A protein has these predicted regions:
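Active-site histidine-anchored catalytic micro-motif
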Residues: 2-171
């Protein structure tokens, strides 16, 4: 059985404590390493190979055009077909739309999945982060090339999804 090779690109967001409110808690009380790489290597030990690249570590509301251009360059330069992007949930949809336009313009045949979390991946007994990350990684086996958001057990095209803040879910 062929192993999937996945290129993970980190943009920040709550999933890794890059959120002003959660950062204060972590900095003062917890001091946890909530990185995706630590989570995958120490807790999951997956049956696929991956590499990780950090483009930025920001609250998604602070992501700017320069960050998006760096993300586009990272996607274009990787040889991997499967690309997972961890991202804050506030502007994830905007980034996904940007990437749809980018891969169409560049004629790239890649599977790009964005995911994030409402609660950080480490430090809380209840978090959606591990589930969202696992669901996203498994989704590479069934998706066609394109850009998707994987959140709350759903796989969405950017134009078909909204973040519902009251319900803490994408729908």
């Amino acid at each position: 059985m062929k192993k999937n090779n996945i290129h993970i690109i980190k943009m920040g967001g709550t999933i890794e404590f890059i959120d002003p409110d959660y950062q204060k808690i972590n900095d003062k009380l917890m001091k946890l390493d909530a990185s995706i790489d630590k989570y995958l290597s120490s807790l999951i030990n997956p049956h696929f190979t991956y590499d990780i690249q950090t483009v930025c570590q920001k609250d998604s509301r602070e992501i700017n055009q320069e960050d998006l251009n760096k993300l586009a360059t990272a996607i274009k330069s990787t040889k991997q077909e499967n690309i997972l992007i961890t991202h804050g949930t506030f502007t994830m949809k905007n980034t996904a739309k940007f990437l749809e336009n980018f891969i169409a313009k560049e004629n790239l045949n890649k599977k790009i999945i964005l995911t994030g979390a409402m609660i950080p991946i480490i430090g809380f007994s209840i978090s959606d982060a591990g589930f969202n990350l696992g669901y996203s990684l498994a989704s590479f086996a069934v998706v066609r090339p394109g850009v998707y958001l994987c959140m709350n057990g759903g796989m969405f095209k950017p134009e078909e999804v909204e973040k519902n803040i009251e319900l803490l879910r994408f729908q």
